[in-house]
Amino acid sequence: MAGSRLETVGSIFTRTRDLIRAGVLKEKPLWFDVYNAFPPLREPVFRRPRLRYGKAKSPTQDIYYHEDQIRAKFYAAYGSGPKAFDLFNPNFKSTCQRFVEKYIELQKLGETDEEKLFVEAGKALLAEGVILRRVEKARTQQEGSQVSRKSESMGVESQTALEENPPLKEVPQAQHLESPGEESKGLSPP
């Protein structure tokens, strides 16, 4: 049993105790008498971890603020926007933060309808000079411009436009910066 590696059968104390009784171990380990005098409240026995299916539940609850719901609505409607966060400026406020502040300011004035508050906060930012573009409209405009390009390429109107403006000549990919009189001196071109 000494070389069986059955760590799962019992605790280290019970296995050591049995080895001493069988005469395999001649001397007691230093910790054996201490463990015997002060046994733990729960015996340390190996247990296989249960298989978990699905997402593991976190022991802490997520903290949501009212502002987070406003931000989620803002990003769903307007996206992150073209302007990046300026992390070097400690007084920088993102468009979303300015929107949330306007939303809360209008809410304190007594408005209760969330949709109306959302629209009014957008209008207030527009009055300050911040232009908000809805994500859905931008996507449909891009798709619409692609469709119009495809339809134009098949029509006669685009052919006449090509005849008026001849296509540009292709520029070679590898351009040498050497003057015509200079020869390359055994070096391969870049």
Swiss-Prot record:
UniProt keyword Signal present: no
Subcellular location per the Swiss-Prot or TrEMBL entry: Mitochondrion
Any single GO CC term annotated in Swiss-Prot or TrEMBL for this entry: mitochondrion
Coiled-coil zones: none
Annotated GO biological process: mitochondrial translation
Family: Belongs to the mitochondrion-specific ribosomal protein mS23 family.
Known partners and oligomeric status: Component of the mitochondrial ribosome small subunit (28S) which comprises a 12S rRNA and about 30 distinct proteins.
Record protein name field: Small ribosomal subunit protein mS23
Species assigned in the record: Bos taurus (Bovine)
Gene behind the chain: MRPS23
